[in-house]
Each structure stands twice: as C-alpha cells, then as structure tokens.
A protein has these predicted regions:
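Gly/Pro-rich active-site capping loops and adjacent beta-alpha segments
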Residues: 16-78, 181
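A short, hydrophobic, proline-anchored segment that marks a local hinge/packing element in signaling
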Residues: 4-12, 22, 162-163
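Accessory "access/gating" subregions that flank catalytic or transport cores
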Residues: 97-179
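Short acidic, glycine/serine/threonine-rich loops at helix termini
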Residues: 1-4, 22, 30-36, 153-157
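Generic structural motif
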Residues: 12, 26-28, 55-60, 147-149, ...
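N-terminal leader/propeptide and maturation segments of large enzyme subunits in energy/redox metabolism
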Residues: 51-130
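Structural motif
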Residues: 8, 17-21, 169-171
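Alpha-helix capping and helix-loop boundary segments enriched in small/acidic/polar residues
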Residues: 1, 7, 36-43, 80-83, ...
C-alpha cells in the first residue's frame, strides 16, 4: 500500500503557497487483517489497513510522531511494525523537504514568473501528449467477470471507452461494474 505525503512550497515571504511537492512511498504493511495489508476478501476499508485521512504530519517544523503513532496503532487493525512506518514517513518528509529546497533554488535563480511559466509549459506539453495518445484509441467495450465474492455473488468490471477524435478526449464509463469494486 502506498502513502502520499504532500507539502506546500511557500513564497519567500511565507504568505502564499506557490507550489506543492509530494512523495509517494510504498509501505510494506499498513495494518489490516493480513500481513502486507489489502487482503482480497476485504468487505470494508478498515480490513485493508489503517485509514489515514488528511493527517498533518508536520506542524511548525516538528514531526508529529506521537500523534501518527496513535493513528497507526489504535486502528481496528493496526500496523504490525510501527517503527518501520515511522522511518518511511520520515524519509518521505525528507524527500519533500529536498523538493522544496530545489524549487526555492530555482525561484531564487530564475524568478517565480519563469518557474511558473515552465511548470505551465510542462502541463501543456503533457496534455498534448495525452490528447495525441487518446486520438489513437479505438472505441471499445469490455466486461471482465471475476471470481465470485465471499458471499457467492457475481463480481465484474465493465468498461466502455467513447472517444471524441475531434476534441481528442475520452469518456470512460464503468456502468455495469459491481458496486464494491
């Protein structure tokens, strides 16, 4: 299971967020009913591991270790090796701090307007690449039947792709997919 740590990048006056950096880390275990988390026979989200919803890991420059330990250890199905999770989270925070430092260096060297212009250029370029790839997709429908659920009910994934070649856009429709998937 992956955990994503997101940090704001503030302007030089610490008044306005100018960017965000993120670090997504794969954690070997986040609790749940089985080691490694995410068992295939889960019937609710808590069986898959500790549910972390918008938790502030760092406050005023201080890692909130006590509080995150409580979250990880006091869940219905807690993590099995909290010290490993803590070390991984600290590494993710360090990665975000490095990203913030590098962005700060770019802004100091080139100025915020140039850096934002390049970020917008990357976004626009990515959109062009994706739209060109979409224009090559053929309309299609798929239905995949899976093994029955633990209660014996049918499980399937249904997908249809409707491509607008002119707009280079696609609508992905999952109608007909089993609700809990």
């Amino acid at each position: 299971p992956d955990i994503t740590v997101v940090s704001p990048v503030w302007d030089s006056k610490k008044k306005k967020v100018i960017f965000f950096v993120a670090s997504r880390g794969h954690h070997t275990d986040v609790g749940g009913t089985t080691p490694g988390s995410m068992p295939p026979d889960s019937s609710d989200i808590h069986q898959e591991g500790v549910y972390i919803d918008n938790f502030k890991l760092v406050s005023q420059g201080n890692f909130r270790e006590k509080e995150i330990r409580e979250v990880l250890q006091n869940a219905k199905y807690p993590v099995r090796s909290v010290d490993i999770n803590i070390a991984d989270l600290k590494a993710q925070i360090a990665a975000c701090e490095k990203g913030i430092h590098e962005i700060d260096l770019m802004v100091k060297h080139y100025g915020i307007d140039v850096v934002k212009a390049y970020v917008n250029h990357m976004h626009n370029n990515a959109e062009i690449i994706v739209r060109n790839a979409i224009s090559k997709i053929k309309e299609a429908s798929f239905c995949y039947s899976m093994d029955p659920d633990i209660d014996g009910s049918e499980r399937k994934i249904s997908t249809s792709l409707k491509v607008d070649k002119l707009k280079k856009s696609v609508i992905i429709d999952f109608s007909g997919t089993t609700a809990q998937l």
